């Protein structure tokens, strides 16, 4: 039984978001729909989710003492990490003291770096993955590349959005790739993973919900990546029945091994009927923003329903849909959006995130579209995104 209090009253149910970007903003909105009190935390002020939260705090979430202080002050009933760069040791301590970390502290810790989740998937669960080696020095990095072979990919074990990642074709690239990986790690220089290149037809994100009434799957989400970030996503991605069954089996194994209730973004490579595990995020996934228009319950609504202990029941997918990012390049602390009226229409929506500033290239919004088929939906979403003019 789920008992929900009313925000700003003595019996309020309080949710603290650790990470207040565009994904956290949608989670906050879903919490608001249920009258939940929302506290948004991030490393910079005026982050998107702070606009729709009851209160907000600006801290370095990798600082365990600062994290413990704000959690002790606010006394949330649910702590919901929305990014990886968090002092997960502190979350495990707090969970041990009786606090509720979503989906659980172990999941946030294992998925914070690529080594934890890769060893769980490949070595404990025996799931198919790319070949890989880990290295923590330049010498061991050279050994790892020799073991994996060319071509290969090097990534910091702790990074996101393609930071520090290189595609290596020859030995001449090794020194530069090592240096770039050391600069791109989320917590500074350190350990890297060297991965063999997987031959695949396409990548999917299988949004998987672990809830009180079992494990549920959204229709597979296809996506296109560029420079480490997604540019378009679409649902449903067409694939064979056997490949879909195998993808669901892998996702089920992973989320049950991680534990807890919530939505997980399970990333997989698909080649014919074969499926290979890539990564998993124990939270809503950026490629899953397409579900804001493609499903009766978005990935954000599903996440909230699951971690509150409510049953999911079933997920209704409306039909072909797509998302395309609005990714301008400029420098401004006073961003404006022009021509939005020309972007929206029947079956086409726009979401603007409300990020306070931009310095270079930054994702500031997303266009959402439906279509007769996936190809048409992608074209409509891209056209809508291109019509929005960002100024500053």
Curated annotation (Swiss-Prot):
Pathway: Purine metabolism; IMP biosynthesis via de novo pathway; N(2)-formyl-N(1)-(5-phospho-D-ribosyl)glycinamide from N(1)-(5-phospho-D-ribosyl)glycinamide (formate route): step 1/1. SUPFAM superfamilies: Glutathione synthetase ATP-binding domain-like, PreATP-grasp domain, Rudiment single hybrid motif. Coiled coil: none annotated. InterPro entries: ATP-grasp (IPR011761), ATP-grasp_carboxylate-amine (IPR003135), ATP_grasp_subdomain_1 (IPR013815), PreATP-grasp_dom_sf (IPR016185), PurT (IPR005862), PurT/PurK_preATP-grasp (IPR054350), PurT_C (IPR048740), Rudment_hybrid_motif (IPR011054). ATP binds at residues 114, 155, 160-165, 195-198, 203. Pfam families: ATP-grasp (PF02222), PurT_C (PF21244), RS_preATP-grasp-like (PF22660). One of its GO terms (biological process) is 'de novo' IMP biosynthetic process. Involved in the de novo purine biosynthesis. Catalyzes the transfer of formate to 5-phospho-ribosyl-glycinamide (GAR), producing 5-phospho-ribosyl-N-formylglycinamide (FGAR). Formate is provided by PurU via hydrolysis of 10-formyl-tetrahydrofolate. Homodimer. PANTHER family: FORMATE-DEPENDENT PHOSPHORIBOSYLGLYCINAMIDE FORMYLTRANSFERASE. This is Formate-dependent phosphoribosylglycinamide formyltransferase. It comes from Salmonella newport (strain SL254). The lineage of its organism: Bacteria, Pseudomonadati, Pseudomonadota, Gammaproteobacteria, Enterobacterales.
